[in-house]
């Protein structure tokens, strides 16, 4: 039986994951007290900001790293199914927020945009063809199209076909249900909704600086006002650390055992941004390529139409950039301060295991704009230097941890949920596809750490997310029904199954 006493929840960070969690808690338990602290002057400035991430609605429609080629040449699409389901769950929750009046004008943050996969070379073409065959036979992806015809590709992505002839070996697949998501705008809308809640207190320019665990299991959270310098202490039954790159240092300050043998390595992304409106207007899709052999998923190149502040723009990247800061607005001492006696062997083991990744990162850092432009020309052969500017986007901190399966110093890709044994501290670490799957991550947090409330919360969660507790992978009828409804709620295009 759940304890019906009001609880105090402290949320650290005002990014997409924190505001998603806060939006859920205020509906599940309206009487609970929520205190949300953000060290900067407004929400969604760091990784969630629309200029600091790729803005892709990651649904595994075009991202080739979610479909893995097996030794026999067949393609495993299980990860793609999982990612697609998670994004559909996110869309359901966003649709609920719109219908309930918590947020408005969904086109401010989500727009329909076809997703295309593009490859060159005989082996890559064979891979894409096999992927197409595997995906088109599964209901989630049965609207996928495939071509090796340059004239068809000219219709799909005319900008990328300029200057090409039919002699080049290349192929593309396309799914029209793709989206571009402005996670910064979505975050701002959710933060504004939380601010209006009578039992929520949202404070900007406030930085959590330390924690003290009390004998009764609750937490004293020390918070510094960055404007005045004043420090206050607030009590919390639950501490939710959703501070992006700042999560690992904060988790370490709690002193919980789960924070040991854990570290992070900061990587930022750079993008080329197009400044020529004529070029921008020739491309109205997201096109993902294939990552170079032996490189991590974050290296997948893509040429993306983006909608930022109501205007179309065009980005290409990412190019990795390394540095010691854990946040764009962080300190050059962040990495060094995160090295502790209890995690130094973890970090050193990771360095030894991942020398190719380190070399790749260094090569990327040394790459000039000319080198970046040469990469762009593999997508858009006639790209001109004067039409593009190099921009440094957000930071991501790759989680490094010890595991039974992989030993010491394993680099964890994706989003990692870490919680204390008593579930009073919850931290979200890692990176992509975090924003796209933020709702599924929040649900995982609820299920793992608030199990005593499951009976009371399940009907409420099913109202927010109609497929909650069911499988969109296994239930085709439910998948199509929820997809049709969310398309209506979010003002997206809906395509009947072929």
UniProtKB/Swiss-Prot annotation:
Source organism per UniProt: Staphylococcus epidermidis (strain ATCC 12228 / FDA PCI 1200)
Pathway info: Carbohydrate metabolism; tricarboxylic acid cycle; oxaloacetate from (S)-malate (quinone route): step 1/1
NCBIfam families the record matches: Lac_Quin_Ox_NO, mal_quin_oxido, PRK05257.2-1, PRK05257.3-2, PRK13339.1
Family matches, as Pfam families: Mqo (PF06039)
Catalytic activities: (S)-malate + a quinone = a quinol + oxaloacetate
GO molecular-function terms, A-Z: 2-hydroxyglutarate dehydrogenase activity; L-malate dehydrogenase (quinone) activity
Protein name: Probable malate:quinone oxidoreductase 2
The keyword Zinc belongs to this UniProt entry's keyword annotation: no
Gene Ontology terms: biological process: tricarboxylic acid cycle
InterPro entries tied to this protein: FAD/NAD-bd_sf, MQO
Keyword annotations: FAD, Flavoprotein, Oxidoreductase, Tricarboxylic acid cycle
Cofactor(s) in the UniProt record: FAD
UniProt similarity note: Belongs to the MQO family.
Record EC number: 1.1.5.4
Flavoprotein among keywords: yes
């Amino acid at each position: 039986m759940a304890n019906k006493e009001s609880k105090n929840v402290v949320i650290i960070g005002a990014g997409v994951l924190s505001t998603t969690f806060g939006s859920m808690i205020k509906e599940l338990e309206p009487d609970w007290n929520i205190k949300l602290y953000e060290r900067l002057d407004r929400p969604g400035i760091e990784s969630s900001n629309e200029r600091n991430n790729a803005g892709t609605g990651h649904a595994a429609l075009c991202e080739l790293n979610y479909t893995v080629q097996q030794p026999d040449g067949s393609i495993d699409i299980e990860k793609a199914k999982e990612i697609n389901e998670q994004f559909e769950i996110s869309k359901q929750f966003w649709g609920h927020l719109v219908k309930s009046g918590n947020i408005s004008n969904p086109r401010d943050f989500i727009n329909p945009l076809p997703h295309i996969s593009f490859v060159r070379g005989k082996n890559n073409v064979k891979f894409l063809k096999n992927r197409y065959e595997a995906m088109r036979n599964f209901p989630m992806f049965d609207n996928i199209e495939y071509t090796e015809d340059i004239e068809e590709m000219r219709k799909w992505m005319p900008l990328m076909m300029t200057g090409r002839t039919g002699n080049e070996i290349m192929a593309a697949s396309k799914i029209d249900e793709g989206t571009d998501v402005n996670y910064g705008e979505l975050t701002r809308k959710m933060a504004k909704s939380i601010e209006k809640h009578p039992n929520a207190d949202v404070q900007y320019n406030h930085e959590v600086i330390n924690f003290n665990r009390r004998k009764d299991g609750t937490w004293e959270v020390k918070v510094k006002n960055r404007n005045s310098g004043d420090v206050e202490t607030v009590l919390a039954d639950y501490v939710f650390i959703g501070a992006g790159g700042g999560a690992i240092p904060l988790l370490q300050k709690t002193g919980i055992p789960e924070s040991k043998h854990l570290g992070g390595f900061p990587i930022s992304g750079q993008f080329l941004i197009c400044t020529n409106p004529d070029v921008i207007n020739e491309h109205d899709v997201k096109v993902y390529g294939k990552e170079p052999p032996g490189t991590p998923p974050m290296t997948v190149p893509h040429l993306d139409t983006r909608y930022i502040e109501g205007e179309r723009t065009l980005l290409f990247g990412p190019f990795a950039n390394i540095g010691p800061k854990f946040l764009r607005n962080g300190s050059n001492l962040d990495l060094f301060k995160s090295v502790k006696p209890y995690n130094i062997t973890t970090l050193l083991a990771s360095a030894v295991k991942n020398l190719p990744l380190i070399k790749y990162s260094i090569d990327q850092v040394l790459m000039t704009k000319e080198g970046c432009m040469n990469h762009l020309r593999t997508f858009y052969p006639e790209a001109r230097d004067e039409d593009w500017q190099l921009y440094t986007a957000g930071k991501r901190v790759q989680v490094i941890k010890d595991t039974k399966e992989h030993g010491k110093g394993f680099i964890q890709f994706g989003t990692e949920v870490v919680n204390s044994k008593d579930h009073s501290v919850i931290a979200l670490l890692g990176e992509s596809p975090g924003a796209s799957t933020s709702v599924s991550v929040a649900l995982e947090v609820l299920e793992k750490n608030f199990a005593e409330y499951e009976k009371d919360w399940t009907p409420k969660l099913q109202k927010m997310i109609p497929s909650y507790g069911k499988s969109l992978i296994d239930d085709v009828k439910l998948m199509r029904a929820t997809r049709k409804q969310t398309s209506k709620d979010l003002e997206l295009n809906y395509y009947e199954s072929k």
